[in-house]
Amino acid sequence: MISIALEHVLTHISFSIISIVISVHLIKFLVPEIIGLCDSLEKGIITTSFCITGLLIIRWVYSRHLPLSNLYESLMFLSWGFSTIHIFSKIWNHQNDLSTITATGAIYCQAFATSGILNEMHQSAILVPALQSQWLMMHVSMMLLSYGALLCGSLLSVSLLVITFRKNIEILEKMNQFSFLIESFLLSEVRPLKKKKSFLQNISFLSFKNYHKYQFTQQLDHWSYRIINLGFTLLTIGILSGAVWANEAWGSYWNWDPKETWAFITWTIFATYLHTRTNQRMPGMHSAIVASIGFLIIWICYFGVNLLGIGLHSYGAFTSN
């Protein structure tokens, strides 16, 4: 009973902290002049990560198996994965451009996990015979970590598409304004020197602004590629370990049930992304579009089987088995 109570306390603490973190990040976005909020954002994510780690360890000790047997446990583990990616990205890149995505992903996973829909799964249960294997830790942890990494990388690609699309619209508007100014300049009389100077300053300011936008989009593309590359590696390991486990449990490496089918589709989509990203003949927009499609495919792969409640991977679905 003590472990269950402690589990509930850690769940509510982590969810409260991550909610405050999102609010702080929103304030920081709206009012960038407030410098002190950056430290509180990082401390909040680190505290949340420790709380979820403690929760998973307690549940592991209490249930005597890795807490990845149902949707509630996998969502909490995915939330832990988002916070872990946030911490490591902060270590690699001090600017931490992933903070919005990782913090938002963590709070949505926790919000759904602690909602009333999954109340029946909050209590630890004995594993079914097929899941009582040492491969559980290897296969499920790799798959969930790959989902977290691929979701982060895909969202960066979505952000890249949105920014590039907006930038193209702004360029068209500025070209129209520029042509109008040139036309006005040619048709009008000679203007004072101050106005010419002001015009040149505006041109240089726009060029400076576009250069920084270009740098930012390049960073988004770079980090999207690195994170998706990591997620693709983890996904490959997860699929291979799952195939070995399936052969031990059911006597076949692959059965084409809904989960396996969508996992293969996910793997194919991100393999296509890596191919287009490394192909010099294709611009970065092509790979970003592929990654954006992959974002939707991951959610179908992750929640699809749980919504259907069929197939060999239907353990821990919404309907009780």
Swiss-Prot record:
The gene is ccsA. The lineage of its organism: Eukaryota, Viridiplantae, Streptophyta, Embryophyta, Tracheophyta. It is a multi-pass membrane protein. May interact with Ccs1. This is Cytochrome c biogenesis protein CcsA. InterPro entries: Cyt_c_assembly (IPR002541), Cyt_c_biogenesis_CcsA (IPR017562), Cyt_c_biogenesis_CcsA/CcmC (IPR045062). The keyword Glycoprotein does not apply. One of its GO terms (molecular function) is heme binding. Belongs to the CcmF/CycK/Ccl1/NrfE/CcsA family.
